[in-house]
Design a protein with these regions (language model features):
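Beta-propeller-forming repeat regions
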Residues: 1-191
Length: 191
């Protein structure tokens, strides 16, 4: 629960990588994205988060044997896999914070199907009843976060955020994948 009650909220990234928060519903997602918004939509971010290089091409199947299936390379037929959105009770107050990655692109988000993520940031947000408020964010991390999870990877009884990073070397097409872990400690608030 984002607010400490037992009322659940649906937190997701939309097709433009904006965070959306909904009241639980049995409606299909396509029915929630209507002109003017739906009554279930509680909040939508102005900024983009997530960002993924993980994609698949849709395959055309017209009742043909598998050997005759065609890969449709039309850019509109590319589906990007959204990064997960994690919730975690950072300060043990019974309220889950939203922890999300923002992959930063060297070319911005001008072209929808052109992604060149070179760095990233991790954000921690808290639900204040009307929207998400930023608690903290990391400094810029060199590399693209392909996935992330919260786990106690060093068995010290404290959870860490574990990143699967893809790091590019400048002036080269070579890439290296690494796992990085950050302690999840609540920063002291400056008064």
């Amino acid at each position: 629960s984002l607010d400490g009650s037992n009322r659940l909220k649906l937190v997701m990234l939309d097709e433009y990588d904006r965070i959306r928060i909904y009241e639980p519903t049995l409606k299909r997602f396509i029915d929630l994205d209507i002109l003017g918004g739906s009554e279930e939509l509680l909040w939508k971010s102005d900024d983009h988060y997530g960002g993924s290089n993980n994609a698949f091409l849709r395959i055309t199947y017209a009742g043909q044997p598998m050997s005759d299936w065609a890969i449709d390379d039309n850019p509109d037929k590319v589906s990007y896999v959204k990064l997960r959105v994690l919730t975690y009770d950072m300060n043990k107050n019974g309220k889950n914070d939203v922890i999300i990655v923002k992959n930063l692109s060297a070319v911005g988000r001008i072209m929808r199907n052109l992604t060149l993520y070179t760095s990233s940031e991790i954000y921690d947000f808290e639900w204040d009843g009307i929207g998400l408020s930023e608690n903290w964010k990391t400094k810029k991390i060199q590399g693209y976060v392909a996935d992330y999870q919260i786990k106690d990877i060093d068995n010290d009884g404290e959870d860490e955020v574990v990143l699967s990073l893809v790091v590019s070397f400048s002036g080269s097409l070579r890439k290296k994948s690494i796992l990085a872990a950050y302690d999840l400690t609540v920063p002291e608030r400056v008064q």
